[in-house]
Amino acid sequence: MDKNDYLKAVDSLNLWAKAYYTDDSPMASDDEYDKLYNAVVQFEKENPDLKLSYSPTNRIGGEILDEFKKISHIEKMWSMEDIFSDSELVAWISRGDKTDCEFFAEPKFDGASLNLLYENGNLISAATRGDGSVGEDVTNNAKVISSVPLQIDYKDKIEIRGEVVITKDDFELINIERSKNSEPPLANPRNAAAGSLRQLDNGIVKQRKLKFYPWGVGENSLKFNKHSQIMDFVRSLGFLHDNFCKVIRGIDELKIAYKELLSVRELKPILMDGMVIRVNDLSKANQLGYTVKFPKFMVAYKFPATEKTARLIDILLQVGRTGVVTPVGLLDGVLIDGAFIKNVTLHNFDEIDRLNLMKNDFVTVIRSGDVIPKITGVFKDRRDGSQSEIIRPKICPKCGNELLDEGVFIKCQNLTCKARVVSSIIYFASKKCMNIDGLGDAIVELLYQKNIIKDIADIYRLDELSFIGLEGFKTKKISNLLSAINNSKTPNLDKFIASLGIEHIGEVAAKKIANNYGDRWLELTLEELLALDGFGEAMALSYLEFMRVNLEKIKELLEFITPKMQNLELKTNIFSGKTVVITGTLSRSRDEFKAELESYGAKVSSSVSKKTDFVLYGNEAGSKLEKANELGVRAIDESEYESLK
């Protein structure tokens, strides 16, 4: 094989692969493909400098990474607003004058979003959605997904977005194989797809038989007027497409399409959890714009939750960071939307009483999307005498101490109870609290079991020697974790207070304490707490009791952490002491405006009433602005806001 033969062979192999994997119309036998493929492999071994970036041999798995790098998306990957009923669909269409719009409808596959970047026709990178702006670099894994072209017939820079999925059949085969190897089953196809994308060994990724279905583009220089035209073009480049993609006009047609897709839900080889509806006209979509979270021109009309019948075998007891004992139902196992469900939440023992639930009952189990499965009903007529009463516990299942029964809640009051300690550490390190990246549930459990950490303060005593002998902890992983811990040592005071896990004291309450009392937060009185807006006696007493019991532990923690105090000298202006509602799309995020207004001493509310002083509005303000006008509330746009502050 010479260079010209090699170039032709690569083109042929890519063409045959597309015909086989994408078009489901083979152009060559397996034997013919394998012979040509092996010839290409041999040529590339002998001529490594001539190897093409889009050679099919680049799909060979086996590369193992230490970690994933981060990649910034050129265009943000937005989340979608969810709706669940025809009435919500009508309301969505009525917002922004979408009544006469043409819509593009397609299945919402239940998988993991992926952003592919192509330049000069070559696949440059692949990244997960991440936080919408920055994702993880999974390029090596994307290259072994057969339905991701390594090269496309389009030279300009373009981001192609889509969903990585696993078929129901392939998912079942994966779990059969895992069972043979005494490995735990994967939870569901969606988690399997997401988890596969994040495998450091792309040999495993190749075995999982992932598929990529595009649903949109990010950065591009295309000249089309409609989203449907963009998708036709993308699919012409060699990507998969589903046969249910429709251009629709009017609410009635959308309802018909939704019912049609719902009727074939179980027949589809891939899990779907709804129908995506978007405004087809790109100029109209651009005009509609975005909220802080979602595009206003598209929505996911979710399918109803799936209900199944199962048998309740037993009740497990979990103990949380505040000591609350939560009952969890153990089922005989039922398959719902590709997920094998064995555990269901029961919230508290009052819920068990409300359902009149007994062990060994047949029950109705419901699961919708990411919602934790729960029991919604009991088939009392099917009781056969084998049922038994569920007894309220009196002893903590984790530490053996006596429980306090408060009615709705049953609590373990032992502050050194293992379950409470571990849950507290996990909560403290979580993303919404101190955001210690890499210190997740499993690692906290492991470090606690090995007696490496026994309380929150021990997190800050960790060093390289702490991880000696622990499986899976390589130098880079340890370095990243210690760096994340070090970066958490100067949080805002409100974030630190919220991270302590004080019952009834969340982000909002913690912010009020920090903003009003600053460095006096450890020595507040009941009267001072009750003086705060929104603080009731239960919140105030909970805070004071936590400080009384845990003061020494908090002081120990403050030897490592230096919370940043908020500036208590508030800048006063026209907004000080006023109630403000923010609505519409502004030049900055709503959270930024909210923080700024609160720094002036304003209260930011989510709804307009007679007590509202100002409504700060942006584009597509909607009903809140209308209500402000009806009530005579002063409405100001962003430019007026800037002049007043």
From Swiss-Prot:
NAD(+) binds at residues 30-34, 79-80, 106, 129, 163, 302. Its EC number is 6.5.1.2. Residues 570-645 form the BRCT domain. Pfam families: BRCT, DNA_ligase_aden, DNA_ligase_OB, HHH_2. Gene3D superfamilies: 5' to 3' exonuclease, C-terminal subdomain, BRCT domain, DNA ligase/mRNA capping enzyme, Helix hairpin bin, Nucleic acid-binding proteins. It catalyses: NAD(+) + (deoxyribonucleotide)n-3'-hydroxyl + 5'-phospho-(deoxyribonucleotide)m = (deoxyribonucleotide)n+m + AMP + beta-nicotinamide D-nucleotide. GO terms for cellular component: cytosol. GO terms for biological process: DNA repair; DNA replication. Transmembrane segments: none annotated. It is an enzyme of class 6 (ligase). Keywords: DNA damage, DNA repair, DNA replication, Ligase, Magnesium, Manganese, Metal-binding, NAD, Zinc. GO terms for molecular function: DNA ligase (NAD+) activity; metal ion binding. Zn(2+) binds at residues 396, 399, 412, 417. InterPro entries: BRCT_dom (IPR001357), BRCT_dom_sf (IPR036420), DisA/LigA_HHH (IPR041663), DNA_ligase (IPR001679), DNA_ligase_AS (IPR018239), DNAligase_adenylation (IPR013839), DNAligase_N (IPR013840), NA-bd_OB-fold (IPR012340). Signal peptide: none annotated. The active site is at residue 108. Its cofactor is Mg(2+); Mn(2+). Belongs to the NAD-dependent DNA ligase family. LigA subfamily. DNA ligase that catalyzes the formation of phosphodiester linkages between 5'-phosphoryl and 3'-hydroxyl groups in double-stranded DNA using NAD as a coenzyme and as the energy source for the reaction. It is essential for DNA replication and repair of damaged DNA. This is DNA ligase.
